[in-house]
Amino acid sequence: MSIIQEFREFAVKGNMIDLAVGVIIGGAFGKIVDSLVKDIIMPLITVITGGGVDFTQKFVVLGNNPDNLQSLDALQKAGVNVLTYGNFLTILINFIILAWVVFLMVKLINRMRRKQEEAPAAPAPTPEDIALLREIRDELKNRPQV
């Protein structure tokens, strides 16, 4: 078997295709969660915390600020060390939501698997030789003792 044939068999196996589909859907789902956090959750948190707070603009200057710059973009362009904790909080919330959804999906899949395992299998039909032996046994039991 040539290496090309081996690769073809490897690439078209069900698990590889399932993995590819999972990666594609995961990438799209990640964008949905990112939008949920950035466009819905963080603005709600901003309103709850008093309004006017944009977490992506929360930072601490770590060092000299020679021109007394105030915006994050200007500080980063000037090469000033900046600790952008607001961006980290946004990404952390994004991760927690994504991890929670994955946890719920795995839990649902495991529950469905358990239900399939718990379903009793239909008893296998008794083989003909065993049935015949049982008939003989029953006949011998019912036979009058001599």
UniProtKB/Swiss-Prot annotation:
It is a multi-pass membrane protein. The keyword Cell membrane applies. Keywords: Cell inner membrane, Cell membrane, Ion channel, Ion transport, Membrane, Transmembrane, Transmembrane helix, Transport. SUPFAM superfamilies: Gated mechanosensitive channel. It comes from the Bacteria. GO terms for molecular function: mechanosensitive monoatomic ion channel activity. The keyword Iron-sulfur does not apply. Its main location: membrane. GO terms for cellular component: plasma membrane. It is found in: Cell inner membrane. The chain crosses the membrane at residues 17-37, 40-60, 89-109. InterPro entries: Mechanosensitive_channel_CS, MS_channel, MSC/AndL, MscL_channel. Homopentamer. Belongs to the MscL family. Channel that opens in response to stretch forces in the membrane lipid bilayer. May participate in the regulation of osmotic pressure changes within the cell. HAMAP family: MscL. This is Large-conductance mechanosensitive channel. The lineage of its organism: Bacteria, Pseudomonadati, Pseudomonadota, Gammaproteobacteria, Moraxellales. The gene is mscL.
